[in-house]
Amino acid sequence: MTSINIKHLVLSGGGLLGISYIGLFKYFEEKNYIKNIQSITGCSAGAIFGSLLAIGYTYNELNSLVKSMIFKEYLKINVDSILNFTNTKGFESGTNLNLFIRKCIKNKTGNENITFSQIQEKYNIKLQIGVTNLTKNKFELLNNTTSPELPIHKAISASVAIPFIFEPIVINNDIYCDGGVLDNLPIDTVINMYNIID
């Protein structure tokens, strides 16, 4: 049987369905595919799970993490958030979700503000997070080339900022939201980036 050599992994968004990625990662662990991965690109839920895979989370760790999550804690819509919608552009600030992401990052790396360049240096993986730049009306990949000193938790928060649900995120004076708005599965971008030939 021909062995599979996965070098570039692209993960789409999908809301709570993103939890299914831990099953994929279990299969990857069993087949020892993860050691050959050179880049991980993710949007929305794919950005969360792709980032955790990049920093070394195992299937068992991710499974325990998901089981411990209380999803209602990350989406708190109340009267005030509805009344302030015209100012905030979202019913939920995303603060609790960002705190959770930062905690996950710190537990594994020791640094909740680890940047794209530090991820590349420490784990030898090019992590890329897909976002929608609302200011420039275009899809972007945030990575160690475009945003080397950006903490990945901020990029993840931008990528999961579903329009009208979560407030958009400001990075370097540009306004960002869920990468899935313009390209939920940026596989063509990755193919062109690495000149992958079918």
Q: Where in the sequence are the language-model features?
A:
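Patatin-like phospholipase
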Residues: 1-43, 51-198
